[in-house]
Amino acid sequence: EDVKHDILQTFDKLNETFISNEIPVIVGEFGLLGFDKSVDTIQQGEKLKFFEFITYYAKEKQLPLMWWDNGQHFDRINFNWRDEQLYKTIIMSLGSRSSTAKTDFIYIKKDAEIKDVDVELNLNGNTLIDIKNGDRSLEKDKDYCINGNILTVKSDFLKSIITNRFGVNATLICKFSAGADWKIDIIYYDTPSLNDMEATEEDFFIPTAFNGTQLKAMESIYKKSKKNTGPNEWTSFKEYNLVFKPANYKIILAPDFLKQLEDGEILLKFYFWSGEAIEYTIIKNGAQIKGISSQADHDKEPDNTYLDEPDGDNKNQAYGENVQGEDNVESYQSE
């Protein structure tokens, strides 16, 4: 809502000051923080809602938008969009509003009771006409029901599609009377596991079993003083893909982040889109970093064999038991 308010305020002012006085305005660049570094910096559903609204409202206020892309989203060699859902959302918003939802995922935890799940829709004047799981249309009032703007996915349907495989077990495609489709991933997961580690600033990372979850955010404070660490000490939250990022079986902390920390104990708190929050302590002594998990058995020696494990292919998506996905994410050392 804060972002929406900023867009309304800015575009209204531009229209009032310039457009209404017959002075043309072009928005020459727009986007999201870290959007040019990785497609996973901003969660997919939140990304789509931003671009749906800004495209719609720019048209309402007669403000042409210029898409400024470094090749992250538009493949300049093969001339196609890497994310078709993003492209369709933007293009369709030029003609009519697309429907969105408060979330584009439903997390089902291992061994937890599976109940009906409510998803709040933002219909934007449209109506829901169909929900598909693959080629099959879900049966209204049996698999799901709709009451106003509340979509309820029934527990029996969720039970029927959940397997013992961590990650995305199904993707529901919601179709509306106008605009782009909205996808909802059904994700089976367990609490992620962060483990102890010892290494230098250059080599340190946190051995992690994601167990189907997606990494959302990280806070960093000095344990004794409770002050925020750098960079950008005005907030305890650190920038995704600049300070930290997920990879195969690990969370990587940027060497530059570790180097600028003061010696002593630093408390990190990792948030996951499943709702889990896990604390992790690092102790810095010169160039040496020791990581202590709030979950780990500290009588065991740290397993530094992780240092020899290749990064592999990964993405901030819940597609593997421990691995966050399928697309390559470069290591900090190679950037």
Residue ranges of predicted features:
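Low-complexity, Pro/Ser/Thr- and charge-rich linker/hinge segments at domain boundaries
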Residues: I186-P207, A287-D299
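Extracellular/luminal ectodomains and secreted, surface-exposed scaffolds of diverse proteins
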Residues: R136-K154, W234-Y249
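Aromatic-rich peripheral "rim/lid" segments of glycoside hydrolase catalytic domains that contact
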Residues: K37-D130, G134
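Edge beta-strands of extracellular beta-sandwich domains
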Residues: A180-D190, E276-A287
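Solvent-exposed, low-complexity, repeat-rich "mucin-like" stalks and linkers
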Residues: G95-S137, L194-E233
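A short beta-strand micro-motif common to beta-rich folds, especially ectodomain repeats
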Residues: F166-A178, G264-F272
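Extracellular glycoside hydrolase catalytic/binding regions
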Residues: E1-T55
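Surface-exposed, short loops/turns at beta-strand junctions within beta-sandwich domains
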Residues: F157-V168, P255-G264
